[in-house]
């Protein structure tokens, strides 16, 4: 069952105590978009943070072959991770054609078992982008297959355009980390990030901030098991 928004949980005690955090996104720039501010805050609290990319964004640059785009977007992601001070891991799915099958379940399960996180953040499962949905399903099933050995949280990417029906129950004030988040996000030069920040992030992060009495915030829902 998903946690219902019966009450706002704007405090951040829930962030404390995590030692190893994976942020698993479908494409280069998704982890940064979802929660780079929270990644930075978790690092400041002493956690090791890893950005995991399900695909390498092979279909994400008009006029480039998949191989060319993969090289460019992996380099951009590594640069962003350097800004954030986190490690980058690339899985082997293909942008625009992410799959849910036995082999892909095994790949995600192997990642979880190798990294041994106590916290994982990934896409909210209701999303207009197929790769985002696939990523969420694979992470959720890995959580189940590994005995729910980590806390699982969902976050949002371009809500309204991509993420749908997302009602957060947890917030993180990222005001002190937002400049660094934007610096990391801007490393994805091939994605025309300036426009995305102006059209989406400024509005969304201010709105989430209003929900928890902060200037800028990121929002989450925890996956619960009963």
Positions of predicted regions on the chain:
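Metal-dependent de-N-acetylase/amidase catalytic core
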Residues: 2, 8-24, 82, 87, ...
């Amino acid at each position: 069952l998903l946690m219902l928004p019966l009450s706002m949980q704007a405090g951040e005690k829930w962030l404390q105590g995590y030692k190893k955090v994976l942020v698993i996104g479908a494409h280069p720039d998704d982890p940064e978009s979802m929660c780079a501010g929270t990644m930075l805050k978790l690092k400041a609290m002493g956690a090791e943070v890893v950005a995991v990319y399900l695909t390498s964004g092979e279909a994400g640059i008009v006029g480039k072959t998949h191989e060319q785009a993969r090289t460019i977007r992996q380099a951009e992601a590594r640069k962003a991770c350097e800004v954030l001070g986190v490690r980058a891991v690339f899985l082997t799915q293909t942008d625009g054609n992410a799959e849910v099958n036995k082999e892909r379940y095994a790949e995600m399960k192997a990642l979880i078992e190798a990294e041994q996180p106590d916290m994982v953040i990934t896409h909210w499962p209701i999303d207009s982008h197929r790769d985002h949905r696939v990523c969420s399903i694979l992470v959720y099933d890995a959580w189940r297959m590994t005995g729910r050995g980590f806390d699982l949280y969902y976050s949002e990417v371009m809500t309204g355009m991509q993420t749908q029906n997302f009602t957060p129950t947890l917030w993180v004030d990222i005001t002190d980390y937002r400049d660094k988040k934007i610096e990391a996000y801007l490393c994805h030069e091939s994605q025309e990030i300036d426009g995305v920040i102006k059209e989406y992030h400024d509005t969304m992060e201010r709105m989430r901030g209003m929900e928890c009495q902060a200037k800028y915030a990121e929002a989450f829902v925890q996956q619960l098991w009963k």
